[in-house]
Amino acid sequence: ADIAVVGGAEAIIHPLPVAAFAQMKALSTRNDDPEHASRPWDADRDGFVIGEGAAIMVIETLEHAQARGAKIYGTLAGSGISADSHDIVQPDPTGSGQASAMRKALASAGLSPCDINHVNAHATSTPLGDTAEAHSVAAVLGKATDQVLVNGTKSMTGHLLGGAGALESFAAVMALLKRQVPGTINIEHLEEDLEVNVVTHTTDLPNGDLAALNNSFGFGGHNVTLAFTNANATH
């Protein structure tokens, strides 16, 4: 197809699913301070915060977009999928499955780690998940790790579950378009020995070609990474 409408939505705040996630001990218990409960990579994080919302995008071939005079926000350059099946809930601490998805996305897009400027991380604010993802991102980026701006938008939106991937993809595209990466909020004490460059305030991206990865990981070890470039990139 030349054009498609894609996205995700979630409205799950109901006693039954909330109780299920609570029983898994996946949710933050910071009930006395909910505005600051979602805190990816903070040393005192204790679980995710459920959010609700939606994001819808139109994706199409460049020729189709130009023919109808559409405003082009960015380019979906590549994608990668993996399934590590480590555990039904807990992430693989080695991050090997996550790294596989990221490497496949880079290969699909024809990009190298040194081309990446930004990673919009899955970063749910869970003790195990954030550390595992930081490890996998660093493993993929290698020597380029320190130059790549990593953020966690779930600190601001909560975890939209089925809507998270679409919303965070759009956030990554807009970061490239605006040449600014929004900071991760609610970090009071950054996790020690963190392997990636987490930004805690809005940070400018350089001029020229830009590229970003967006990670979305799920229970059971299924991992998806999308690679985006700015609209006029010549990678």
Model-flagged regions — what are they?
Residues A1-H64, A164-H235:
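Conserved beta-strand-centric core segments of catalytic alpha/beta enzyme folds
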Residues A4-A9, K71-S79, C114-A121, V148-K154, ...:
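Beta-strand segments within the central parallel beta-sheet cores of soluble alpha/beta enzyme folds
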Residues A9-V18, P113-G129:
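Conserved beta-ketoacyl condensing-enzyme motif
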Residues D32-A109, H118, A233-T234:
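Condensing-enzyme catalytic core mediating Claisen C-C bond formation in acyl metabolism
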Residues G69, A109-S112, L141-D146:
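Short helix-capping segments at alpha-helix termini
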Residues H86-Q98, T124-L141, D146, L160-L167:
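Short glycine/threonine-rich loop-to-helix capping motif typified by GTGT followed
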Residues A101-A109, S136, V140, A172, ...:
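Stable alpha-helical structural segments in soluble proteins, enriched in small hydrophobic residues
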Residues T153-M156, S216:
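Glycine-rich, charge-dense phosphate/pyrophosphate-binding loop(s)
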